[in-house]
């Protein structure tokens, strides 16, 4: 019996593995993202791994309208208006491919009417039920803050310029007011390119 070379992957892929044996407790699930085409090395990459049904299933999927919704914008009653939280695995890669952090978190759809847009914002929650109760990482380099319980990946909603919100809040940062930090990132959802969103 000889070994073959296996499959050749030329695009992003997420590998999830678990060890199972009769009469033994299964291992933890191990997840790792392989990002091959990060052409913009100036931005961090956020890879989100989630069970597909938790996104797309008409009954339990949080990213879809579902079966009972108002047929006019912003589609009230759609699944994405529910306050559902689903378990995900997040990996943040700094420019150059260096892993920043990887962790299981809770994820919700975030925002107001932007929930009805194709690219939705997500909020993430570190909870002990998923593993660690906080994220020990400096999400915003130079901020001096390296411990978070939650953060947002904010889509651009109706802002087609895609950086207006972050830019405007950064203008106030030197005026002794509290503002949200802003960091654009390339996002992959289950290995699919999902656009550029802002870490907030």
Tell what function each PLM region has.
Residues 23-29:
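Short, exposed coil/turn segments at beta-strand boundaries within extracellular/luminal domains
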Residues 11, 36-40, 200:
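C-terminal, active-site-flanking charged/polar segments
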Residues 11-15, 86:
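Exposed beta-strand face motif in extracellular beta-rich ectodomains
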Residues 1-9:
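Short, small-residue-biased leader/transition segments that mark boundaries at the very start
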Residues 20, 48, 66-200:
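Conserved ATP-binding subdomain of kinase catalytic cores across diverse folds
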Residues 14, 18-19, 40:
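Intrinsically disordered, low-complexity segments enriched in small residues
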Residues 33-58, 116:
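Low-complexity, Pro/Ser/Thr- and charge-rich linker/hinge segments at domain boundaries
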